């Protein structure tokens, strides 16, 4: 594969001295990912900081912008599990990545400019979901709304104080024993009725 060479259980790319590497979605350490190592593994970390290897979301797309202006390179690893990246951390001139298992699809996109690489990537994965208008509005969110009555009281207080409110975000308290895709019917007997009337 041009640009990439096999390296044990992964691949490597030799970077120029001033190449910039973008991508990986919700990751620490600024826009240029060079000089650190990362994992994309969808972990729910309670403490976010510069030294974390992984955050909540995994976006296995890198965009390399070569310093010499020779054109940009996009690398997309289509894999649902853990991917490890060493982006100039061990060796400043080497980007290396490896998946936890061998069943993945690897895509390499080249174009003269970053915008063209991004366009090709979007064509590959499909258009982004566009949220409803209310999702861009004002939200009240916290952990600890224990019942439907709590939610209704928050909405009533916003209304009584003439404050704008487009949504109330609940954490895991509505779940039955904190199990995904469940609702505790004792505390939230009519969850569907909670949207404002």
Language-model features, listed with the residues they occupy:
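Aromatic-lined carbohydrate-binding/catalytic grooves of carbohydrate-active enzymes
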Residues: 129-197
């Amino acid at each position: 594969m041009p640009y990439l060479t096999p390296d044990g259980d992964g691949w490597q790319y030799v970077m120029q001295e001033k190449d910039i590497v973008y991508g990986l979605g919700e990751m620490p350490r600024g826009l240029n990912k060079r000089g650190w190592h990362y994992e994309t593994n969808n972990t729910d970390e309670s403490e976010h900081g510069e030294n974390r290897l992984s955050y909540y979301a995994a976006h296995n797309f890198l965009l390399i912008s070569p310093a010499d202006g020779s054109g940009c390179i996009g690398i997309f690893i289509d894999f649902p599990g853990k991917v490890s990246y060493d982006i100039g951390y061990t060796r400043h001139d080497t980007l290396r990545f490896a998946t936890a298992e061998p069943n993945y699809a690897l895509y390499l996109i080249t174009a003269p400019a970053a915008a063209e690489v991004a366009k090709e990537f979007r064509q590959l994965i499909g258009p982004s979901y566009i949220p409803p208008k209310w999702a861009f509005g004002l939200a009240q969110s916290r952990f600890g709304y224990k019942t439907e009555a709590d939610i209704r009281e928050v909405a009533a207080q916003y209304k009584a104080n003439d404050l704008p409110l487009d949504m109330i975000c609940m954490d895991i308290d509505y779940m039955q024993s904190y199990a995904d895709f469940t609702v505790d019917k004792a505390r939230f007997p009519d969850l569907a009725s909670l949207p404002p009337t």
